[in-house]
Amino acid sequence: MIKTKKDLREYILADESRYGKRKHALLGWFFGDEAYMTLKFLKRLRYTEYYFNTLNKKNPFKLLRFCWSFFLYRRMWDKYKLQVPLNVVGPGLYIPHRAGGVYMNAKRVGKNFIISSGCVLGAKGDADNIPSIGDNVECCIGSMVIGKVNVGSDSIIAPNSVVIKDIPGG
């Protein structure tokens, strides 16, 4: 959870480091670079998490700042088809391809998580039956993790697979 500006910097640097050395931001914007757009979304996600966690309802400026950031975040959510909820994903999230959409409804996702396009982390039935993902996990293209499933650390979920039972770490 991002509670201080130091945490915010660490999360953003961890996310950016997963994408390697980037070109100038203006070139990424002009040519519509996929990694640039994804990093832009991740930065907005992290700032919105920070504003939400430090929200003081007595201070109207902080409330306004959070509302504006949340508006921009939801706009990018719809535009890029990346449904990543607040305060769920750890530092170092990497989304190599966002073309098919990414849908996350998880309890917790560990650090250095890789999720490709068309992946679904979803509930089965009620809202309590949602997956929990460990550290250094990779979800390949089209994979699904459905229900109250614990995926252990250092796991790889194969392309187009459906996970409905726990996966041990290793």
Task: Write out the residue ranges for each language-model feature.
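Terminal amphipathic alpha-helical/low-complexity segments used for targeting or macromolecular assembly
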Residues: 1-80
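Left-handed beta-helix
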Residues: 80, 85-86, 90-97, 102-106, ...
